[in-house]
From Swiss-Prot:
One of its GO terms (biological process) is peptide catabolic process. Belongs to the peptidase M20B family. The active site is at residues 80, 173. It catalyses: Release of the N-terminal residue from a tripeptide. The keyword Metal-binding applies. Its EC number is 3.4.11.4. The lineage of its organism: Bacteria, Pseudomonadati, Pseudomonadota, Gammaproteobacteria, Enterobacterales. This is Peptidase T. Zn(2+) 2 binds at residues 140, 174, 379.
Length: 410
């Protein structure tokens, strides 16, 4: 498979789990280790303009092989894996010619079952790369990295026409910092694609508007034996606060274009409690209303408290729906759709119920929709990717590059 699988297996051997709440970028040393290994690989493969920034963003270029002017385009993937599940000592399992039924993950009781994951019914006969049940796999987004590099290596060998192609591998995407230090001007592409999606055919240019909501609740602790009229239990207030958040609008109750409120963490004592929510909505007006709801709940629950006891809400916008930017450049989507169809893939246009580096970059002047990788069930032990899906992603990347050149030909 032209080293595609070998590349992927090599990349997932690096522990690149990012870490929230860390000021430095990248947030973990493992990401820099992978970046340096990729830098060396790109040098050996003959790529040009290879730059590794101090924040761990690796960029490189494949120069045009045609005489006419072609818009420079880019392909981007991220090096980190989710902080929500271990990415250390990943031990991939390779199952060729999947015949259906449960797949044992390692030697324990963990299985990958089509009962829980019906998509497996569509993958009979495919080669599946799974976890051993102890870690995530890292197809999000090391499959994307392997696909981009493999596609460009094949482009060089095939002599298919293409213009200048830029590539970038970013750190800390999973914690929302992937594009924070991305130099759009130096990248010098007219548009780009993140290769960070899921199943074959996924093409995404809509994502959530996102905000982080910190709720600080200050109570008053006294001996419970003499607490009447004096104690203000911050934990009780925290419970009341959460009871006012619409239960039917949680992640486990929503899908498609529905937004949600998600209680991500809570901790506390009688004296103080802290709740962390994330709020998401595709519609900008709905997004603003959700943030206002969080403020309104605080006002309602905190009404009548002693001045020394209070509920404080801090809201920080994280990213916005890139549709606002990408839909101004419809040819970018049309190009990707045509490339997929040319590769016998029917595009599956769907909203991203999350975010990507592309969301940030689109608002920095680099329109950047998202392409599939062939992976499934990200951020956990049931994550897997198909080799056939990865091969199709490689083909689509190559076809996008070729079509861009052909359409620019005088």
């Amino acid at each position: 498979m032209d080293k595609l699988l070998d590349r992927f297996l090599n990349y997932v051997s690096f522990d690149t789990q990012s870490k929230s709440g860390v000021r430095q970028v990248p947030s973990t040393d493992g990401q820099l280790k992978l970046a340096r290994a990729l830098q060396q690989e790109l040098l050996e493969l003959g790529f040009e303009q290879i730059v590794l920034s101090k924040q761990g963003c690796l960029t490189a270029a494949l120069p045009s092989n045609v005489a006419w002017s072609v818009p420079a385009i880019g392909f981007i993937s991220h090096m980190d894996t989710s902080p929500d599940f271990s990415g250390k000592n990943v031990n991939p399992q390779i199952l060729e010619n999947y015949r259906g039924g449960d797949i044992a993950l390692g030697v324990g009781d963990e299985v990958l079952s089509p009962v829980m994951f019906p998509v497996l019914h569509q993958l009979l006969g495919h080669t599946l790369i799974t976890t051993d049940g102890k870690t995530l796999l890292g197809a999000d987004d090391k499959a994307g990295i392997a696909e981009i590099i493999t596609a460009l290596v094949r482009l060089k060998k095939s002599q298919l026409p293409h213009g200048d192609i830029r590539i970038a591998f970013t750190p800390d995407e999973e914690i929302g910092k992937g594009a924070q230090f991305f130099d759009v001007k130096a990248f010098n592409a007219q548009w780009a694609y993140t290769v960070d999606g899921g199943g074959v055919g996924e093409l995404e240019y809509e994502n959530f508007n996102a905000a982080s909501v910190q709720v600080k609740i200050v109570g008053n602790n006294v001996h419970p034996g003499s607490a009447k009229g004096v104690m203000v239990n911050a934990l009780t207030l925290a419970s009341r606060y959460h009871q006012h958040v619409p239960e039917s609008e949680s992640p486990e109750q929503t899908e498609g274009y529905q937004g949600f409120y998600h209680l991500h963490s809570m901790k506390g004592s009688v004296e103080r409690a802290d709740l962390h929510y994330i709020v998401r909505d595709f519609d900008r007006n709905g997004f603003e209303q959700r943030k206002q709801t969080m403020l309104d709940i605080a006002e309602k629950v905190g009404a009548g408290l002693h001045p020394d006891c209070y509920i404080e809400v801090t809201i920080t916008d994280t990213y916005y729906n890139m549709r606002e930017q990408v839909e101004q450049h419809p040819h970018i989507i049309a190009l990707a759709q045509q490339a997929m169809r040319d590769c016998s893939i029917e595009p599956n246009m769907k909203p991203i119920r999350g975010g990507t580096d592309g969301a940030h970059l689109s608002f920095q002047g680099l329109p950047c929709p998202n392409l599939f990788t062939g992976g499934y069930n990200y951020h956990g032990k049931h994550e897997f990717v198909t080799l056939e899906g990865m091969e199709k992603a490689v083909s689509v990347i190559m076809r996008i590059a070729e079509l861009t050149a052909l359409r620019a030909k005088p």
